[in-house]
Amino acid sequence: MTSLRKTHPLLKIANSALIDLPTPSNISAWWNFGSLLGLCLASQIVTGLFLAMHYTSDISTAFSSVTHICRDVNYGWLVRNMHANGASFFFICLYTHIGRGLYYGSYLYKETWTVGVILLLLTMMTAFVGYVLPWGQMSFWGATVITNLLSAIPYAGQTLVQWIWGGFSVDNATLTRFFAFHFLLPFVIAAFTAIHLLFLHETGSNNPTGLNSDADKIPFHPYFSLKDLLGFTILILTLTSVALLTPNLLGDPDNFTPANPLVTPPHIKPEWYFLFAYAILRSIPNKLGGVLALLASVLILATVPFLQTSKQQALTFRPLTQLVFWTLIANIAILTWIGGMPVEYPFVSIGQLASLAYFSIFLIIIPTTGWLEDKTLKWSRT
């Protein structure tokens, strides 16, 4: 008799995606981060839902409602700390997942990769509107500065900014709509995740060699479901440790002060996971140029599949491009550091050089090394 999971209309979908899914036998721990992102998303939705039960999206009570959650609600402090630090862990997993995709050439599955880039943009947008909700100093000024960037759009810019604000400045209407977006977007992310998986299961997973693995595949369960469970355990332990022991490690002290439109913080900066893009934005003195560079810093990922020059998919057997890849990682770390520094010498110059290197690596250096490696191996693209 055929198992129910193989015949039932709903269980059949879950079975083909999570149980009987043919998976390359040699995928490493770098492939764990997709499922970890699913765990992060589920955790953020659950903790966010409990926070939304007690939060009020009104500028006169928003800050107080967050204080009330932490002081008076049963385990409210824990839910809030898990949610705030969960966002950081979400981005750690997200950037690692993208890094793995770049290293092993997963971007050659163009549909999956494009949906992934959309997911990245949606997650960044969700995190940005979420950061505004506690209505602290950095929340208010971050919202003001980032939304103001849209005024650089010729002709329609100023109108667009006021339309987003719902008035002539960041005010009550802005907070209310940001809360609405922050509540809605995670469900949009969940829907796009389903599309992401749909496209992935059309082609099957890549593997560390970058070679076809059809001849050597094993069922996802129990092998990789158990392997993912280990990843879940490590992530949950690390997240709870941070939430319980150093909950404010990754936050900004300015956000413990209620928003005041009359007092500007000495250094306006976003959360750590946006600092690399913020450094690129600041490295261009022109407002419109900076906004375009900021957009390009993320959207450049969408161009990667079209810049492939090597005949090999992964970087596993490509030492020259490996060196360039790790240079890119170091460069992003430098940009993250610069993004948190004041706008003064030598940080401005370092930021400009690092921004130039960032785009050069993607657009010029990696395609060149790919071509060079093929030449060295006397391979010609067919």
Swiss-Prot record:
Heme b b562 binds at residues 83, 182. Heme b b566 binds at residues 97, 196. Its main location: mitochondrion. Keywords: Electron transport, Heme, Iron, Membrane, Metal-binding, Mitochondrion, Mitochondrion inner membrane, Respiratory chain, Transmembrane, Transmembrane helix, Transport, Ubiquinone. GO terms for biological process: mitochondrial electron transport, ubiquinol to cytochrome c. Pfam families: Cytochrom_B_C, Cytochrome_B. It is a multi-pass membrane protein. SUPFAM superfamilies: a domain/subunit of cytochrome bc1 complex (Ubiquinol-cytochrome c reductase), Transmembrane di-heme cytochromes. GO terms for cellular component: mitochondrial inner membrane; respiratory chain complex III. Binds 2 heme b groups non-covalently. The keyword Transmembrane helix applies. A ubiquinone binds at residue 201. The keyword Thylakoid does not apply. The cytochrome bc1 complex contains 3 respiratory subunits (MT-CYB, CYC1 and UQCRFS1), 2 core proteins (UQCRC1 and UQCRC2) and probably 6 low-molecular weight proteins. Component of the ubiquinol-cytochrome c reductase complex (complex III or cytochrome b-c1 complex) that is part of the mitochondrial respiratory chain. The b-c1 complex mediates electron transfer from ubiquinol to cytochrome c. Contributes to the generation of a proton gradient across the mitochondrial membrane that is then used for ATP synthesis. Heme 1 (or BL or b562) is low-potential and absorbs at about 562 nm, and heme 2 (or BH or b566) is high-potential and absorbs at about 566 nm. This is Cytochrome b. It comes from Sigmops gracilis (Slender fangjaw). The lineage of its organism: Eukaryota, Metazoa, Chordata, Craniata, Vertebrata.
